[in-house]
Amino acid sequence: MTLIYILILAGVSIFSRLLPTYGKGLILVASILVVLPTMTDWEEVGIYYTSDGIADIFILLTAYLLPLSIIANWNNIRSLLYFELILNLGVILLINFMCQDMLSFYVYFEISLAPLFILIGLYGANNRDKAADYILIYTLFSSLFMLLAIGTYEVLIGNTDYQAVSLVVLSTDLQCILFLCISAGIMVKTPLVPVHTWLPVVHSESPLAGSMLLAGVILKLAVYAIIRLIIPTLSDATVLYTPVVYVICAITIIYTSIITLRQTDLKVIVAYSSISHMAVCILGILSNSLAGINGSLILSLAHGFVSPALFIIVGGILYDRYHHRLIYYYQGLLTYMPILAIYLLILSFSNIGTPLTVNFIGELLSLTGAIGRSTILGCISAFSVLLSAAYMLKVTNRLTGGIRTPYTALTSDCTYRESLLMIALIIPTLWYGLYPNGIINMIWQGSKLLYIFVITQYNVIGNI
């Protein structure tokens, strides 16, 4: 194994001589992947970094999407600053998933906004200033409440280490206050109604790589924050507020799905579908069931494959050729871009949660856990499957069926680079849908420990 690591790093080092900026980023990613099974202590400052099965899937997802996001913009943007911003964002996200301290998590949670803000501000679309302001105001302001909660832990126990905080028993009233403070940051980051309006704006104005990493990884910080900051530390408050969170998630799923049906901007459609899927992830992780926890993690991974791929199609392949994102400009792709049409069909059915895709497994387990926790709200949320089928089939039927519109001149089908991106994201979606044991085995230890903690610490288990 050591020899394999040495060969990997040697190969990356040779590559870095050819492309210094990209090579540096690859060395950072490879170095972090090498130390996945290890723990790194910085005892002098009370910080250490490690990973478990839960963190591993987010770390590997980030490392997988990072080079793909660079390749996606290869023909459009060649600025070294652009690629360095992407690499910096990726490394910040990797460290965020590995840190074992609340304060460190918050710091990297906020620092991740900096490269994304600059990416959108410098390389975004026409309304990029508005989008950059949205992401700064919404996410930064809401996270101040999270900082207040973390500061409370520091004052009370003199430590913000995950394990140390989980051992402290706080009063129910204080737990409720801390729960609301931490949830304020998570709710915006997910995002849930009514603080969701920033995400479609940011996606519509963001460069392609920014949209890929935002949908694929950054939104997952909300699920990860619940696992690390809320469930192990605020058990009483979680039991009390889970019904409220379930109501908000159900409203988010139904509302955003209906809004998606009325959208005409293809990028906004994909953005709203991301909101709905992330709400399902929140339902699963708070279901107090092993099925729901596993389903939430699997769906997070599945969404990390499918959503960036859809953004590549609507914000990359089609937009690069025709410079339009409105659905009315496109029709009949099956006749003049058949390869792209096939990719779109596969990804649309994956986004719906069709059997034999990893999305199906994630949604099935998440909704099973949600229905077990709250039958009524879980069943209402299950309508997300029908609504997502409605808007995705609407998009697919419009784009692939019929004859070519006058707005779209005949052009070449997907290039080798574009097909490489599509195949790289479609293969894991289908592979893990057919053979999900690889994911389940990876997350099993972490999710099982989380479930054991839930059933031993939480006083209320079952239907709400």
UniProtKB/Swiss-Prot annotation:
Superkingdom as given in the UniProt entry: Eukaryota
Write down any Gene Ontology CC term. mitochondrial membrane
Keyword field: Electron transport, Membrane, Mitochondrion, NAD, Respiratory chain, Translocase, Transmembrane, Transmembrane helix, Transport, Ubiquinone
* UniProt-annotated location(s): Mitochondrion membrane
Its placement in the membrane is given as:
Multi-pass membrane protein
Q: Which residues cross the membrane?
A: 18-38, 54-74, 79-99, 102-122, 131-151, 168-188, 207-227, 239-259, 266-286, 297-317, 332-352, 375-395, 420-440
Q: Which reaction does it catalyse?
A: a ubiquinone + NADH + 5 H(+)(in) = a ubiquinol + NAD(+) + 4 H(+)(out)
Q: Does the keyword Transport apply?
A: yes
Please give the PANTHER family that the UniProt record associates with this protein: NADH-UBIQUINONE OXIDOREDUCTASE CHAIN 4
The text of the family note is: Belongs to the complex I subunit 4 family.
What is the stated purpose of this protein?
A: Core subunit of the mitochondrial membrane respiratory chain NADH dehydrogenase (Complex I) that is believed to belong to the minimal assembly required for catalysis. Complex I functions in the transfer of electrons from NADH to the respiratory chain. The immediate electron acceptor for the enzyme is believed to be ubiquinone.
Q: Can you name this protein?
A: NADH-ubiquinone oxidoreductase chain 4
Organism, per UniProt?
A: Candida albicans (strain SC5314 / ATCC MYA-2876)
Q: What is the lineage of its organism?
A: Eukaryota, Fungi, Dikarya, Ascomycota, Saccharomycotina
Gene designation per UniProt = NAD4
